Amino acid sequence: MQKYHFTGLDCPDCANKLESALNKQSYVQEARVVFNTNTLYLKTQDMPKALALIKQLEPDMELSEQVQSEAKPSAIPLLLSVVLYLIAVATIHFSAQNWALHLSYALLAGVYLVAGKDVFLGALRAIRNKQFFDENTLMLSATIAAFGVGAHEEAVSIMVFYSAGEFLQQLAIARSKQSLHALLDVAPNHAVRKVGQELQEVEPSALAIGDVVIVKVGEKIPTDGVVLRGESLLDQKALTGESLPVNVKEHSAVLGGSINLKGVLEIQVSKLYADSSVAKIVDLVSNAVSQKSQTEKFITTFARYYTPAVFAIALLIALVPPLLGHGDFDTWIYRGLFALMVSCPCALVISVPLGYFGGVGAASRAGILIKSVQTLEALSQVKNIAFDKTGTLSKGEFNVIDVVPIAPFSKEDVLQHATCAQILSTHPIAISIQKAYKRQCQHEVKDYQEIGGLGVQASCHSHLIIAGNDKMLHKYNIPHDTCSLEGTIVHVAVDGKHIGYIVVADTLKDNAKECLDGLKHAGIEHMCILSGDHEYSTKRVAKELDCPYYANLLPEDKLNAFKDFQAQHAHKSMFVGDGINDAPTLARADVSMSMGSASQISKESADIVITNNSLESVLKVFKIAKKTKRIIIENIIFALAIKAMFIVLGLSGDASLWEAVLGDVGVTLIALANSMRTMRI
């Protein structure tokens, strides 16, 4: 699929119509016009023909493969129109001279033409393309009808206020787009490659694995790599949501898109730019907002029928009452024009996708990557969550929580011998014991041997040391009376004598309890833990969190347990895992979330990726989803209510046309401002 950036398209309804027209063509497999990011995705067998159709429907639209800045709308024509309109109206009402009145009406005609230039051109283009219910066509029809019933000043005021509204709307849209583009602007735009003693400025995409790049203070790291020389602080807020700078030095892994805050770094490239963390993040966010939620699809379909329906209502208001003898045609045509004033669905067509985009953007800034707006919408409907334990609720890091010596040996003796036996091991349990001892083994270790599933043995200071589980002691016929201990136990024996054991456990993540309590308050009704770990460890964590659990689950068992969990409870269910061993369950869930890091994004298959590995982000993304949904519903209800109110006012004759125009424009601006609140969640 080809991706284009465009300029010259300033109407969201026009974007929807262009997308619909392209998708109707037999030579187009798929077309998506994303108004909020000025992006066109096009998959076609005949690109020249597709581009020609775009030019026919939107002559001012310019396509480019590079992002281009849009020119800001000029306020001069609008200001000129307003000034001349006020002069003309004042002259009509306060001057009795015939020549002044004639001049004033000539001025009104000029104002009408200047203010309505874009409307005339848009209407002409719409009629040529057989789009008779285009907003420009309807606005032109309304003003001509107003002239026809003698409401000359109001006809011109409609055009002036409509132009003012369009100008303010364009400014608001431009501002919102700037916020959205800033979100996607985390990608570096250049790299300084070191070749020998020469420095070359190149595109990040031109870098190869093994290249060396120089990154100065204030510059972005072009792609993922490893620090060869230098020490610095990196700002990774745009990638992980972490506000505190990260300290890096020689041999530290760094992420593309990080901003260098201090010192010069020499970095060896470890990933091509296309595979880098920052490229994946930009791609995920861009792809997310290019999709349409169910609400957006409904609004797009609704807008297709809304305008013709309102036009029909306006026609009925204008014709039926006078034909039935209730008043004259001029009065009812004037009232029917009210319906035409509210015939444009812009308030909904703009605000709904912008609201979802803002929600995705707010999540991204917090280190939460949502892969589609459909996911954000579905997340607001989730009532049930199942958690993996290790690496999700717990840190996935073992710690020594108890040391039990057997007299005459001490805790120090047990830790020392266990450390010496496991000094060459890289197993997480061995590392936790070494960390607890806090000293290095002072004696030479010989004959080190790992025995799969049991433990290790080694010779140290003329002693044979064994460190392992209960089965290890039985294998070597070492007497002991501690066979039924619960938990992860490392027994230690020296020269065939059991000297004690060490209890090792995974620890809960910070704020895990607060997070689950927060989820309950946020509307989650049912939670459980699905773990592949043994019963004791899972039970201990579940007890701390006051949560049901299932332990000793293989991947297929975990999938079946989650299916049962889904079947037992109504509404959508989500699974939160580490994204590594939970693939079947992640795929089964209505919404799937994985705890990971920014460097693992390309490996994740979940709908949502928490790049900062924080449980607080699980609660935050729920709040974002619910607030986004609430804001969008507010906009829909508000816009439809105001439009209905103006139709009623039109029927009763209690307001003038220019008030209807201002009201309709005001609805759009308020809905737009309300949608932008999602960016600040």
From Swiss-Prot:
Residues where Mg(2+) binds: 578, 582
Topological category with respect to the lipid bilayer: Multi-pass membrane protein
Active site annotation, chain numbering: 388
Keyword annotations from UniProtKB, A to Z: ATP-binding, Cadmium, Cell membrane, Cobalt, Cobalt transport, Copper, Copper transport, Ion transport, Magnesium, Membrane, Metal-binding, Nucleotide-binding, Phosphoprotein, Translocase, Transmembrane, Transmembrane helix, Transport, Zinc, Zinc transport
Subcellular location: Cell membrane
Binding residue positions for Cd(2+): 11, 14
InterPro entries per UniProt: ATPase_P-typ_cyto_dom_N, ATPase_P-typ_TM_dom_sf, ATPase_P-typ_transduc_dom_A_sf, Cation_Transport_ATPase_IB, HAD-like_sf, HAD_sf, HMA_dom, HMA_dom_sf
Pfam families: E1-E2_ATPase, Hydrolase
Leading EC class: translocase
Record-listed Co(2+) binding positions: 11, 14
Entry EC number(s): 7.2.2.12, 7.2.2.21
GO CC annotation, single: plasma membrane
Purpose of the protein: Couples the hydrolysis of ATP with the transport of cadmium, zinc and cobalt out of the cell.
Extracellular side: 93-102, 152-154, 328-332, 653-660
PANTHER family: CADMIUM/ZINC-TRANSPORTING ATPASE HMA2-RELATED, CADMIUM_ZINC-TRANSPORTING ATPASE HMA4-RELATED
Cytoplasmic side: 1-72, 125-131, 175-308, 351-630, 677-681
Domain of life: Bacteria
UniProt similarity note: Belongs to the cation transport ATPase (P-type) (TC 3.A.3) family. Type IB subfamily.
Protein name, entry field: Cadmium, zinc and cobalt-transporting ATPase
